[in-house]
Amino acid sequence: MDQSANKLALVEPSNFNFNTETFDTNVFQNDVQFNKLKIFEEFDNFISTLDKNKISFNILKSPKNSPDSIYPNNWVVTFEDGTYDLFSMHSPNRRIERSNSNINFLNKNYSLKCDLTKYEAKNIFLEGTGSLVLDRINKTAYMAESNRSNIRLASKWSQLRGYDLVHFKSYIDKKPTYHSNVLMFITDKFAGICFDSISDSKYLLSNIEKTHEILYLSIEQVKNFSGNALLAVSYTHLRAHETGYN
């Protein structure tokens, strides 16, 4: 089992825009004017960086009317055993991202193991590795509770996948943190966490310090998306850290 990703899934930002359906739950979201040319320039630069570091990736098409489609990890998660899981999305326009072409791509490369999409009809949500920060080596899932990260559904998923669930409450600007992966990340050796946003930080620290060296993140750093990080390995087996784009 490895914590690093050996291939990335990227979605071209052709529909990236302000999402009115997620604004109420995302404290980081601001209604600003989007510069499409700048967005594609950054996307192309990122691809060049991946190529330079010999990191493999696939580029998926963005379905129409899907402003957040560049975050596919919220609706689908793949695993080392060649399986994938589909997750329950809070926003209707995020469910569009499960397009036929994207599902066909997944089915050609993986086998579906767990489908949680039926819980959308019950208003019960769990949004992939946005909700769950996975320690794949030690089989532990860390989750900040929110209306987009349901404890019961997370427990059901954890039991199916054989993970231990560690859940906690997190607040930024007096609002629940909508996704766990904005405030913490995990690599094979260390974990970056914003303890200042967590109510019972001692509980989380006692769990994660058993397996990882801790990198402390400030709320200001989290607001600048230092918590969105991923450990990637190149096809020459050299490792690289790239901060998440949000």
Tell me the role of every PLM-derived stretch.
Residues E12, S88, R136, M143-N147, ...:
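Short, structured patches in soluble enzyme cores that scaffold and shape functional sites
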Residues T236-T243:
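Conserved small/polar residues in nucleotide/adenosyl-binding loops
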Residues S56-K61, K113-Y119, V166-K169, L215-L217:
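General small-molecule cofactor/ligand-binding pocket signal
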Residues D2, S69-N73, V77-T78, L126-R136, ...:
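Structural signature of eukaryotic scaffold interfaces centered on beta-propeller domains
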Residues N53-N93:
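Long, hydrophobic/aromatic-enriched structural stretches that serve as scaffold segments
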Residues M1-K61:
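N-terminal leader/transition segments
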Residues S91-N150:
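Hydrophobic alpha-helical segments and helix pairs
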Residues L153, V166-A229:
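Redox- and metal-dependent alpha/beta enzyme cores, enriched for Fe-S-associated oxidoreductases
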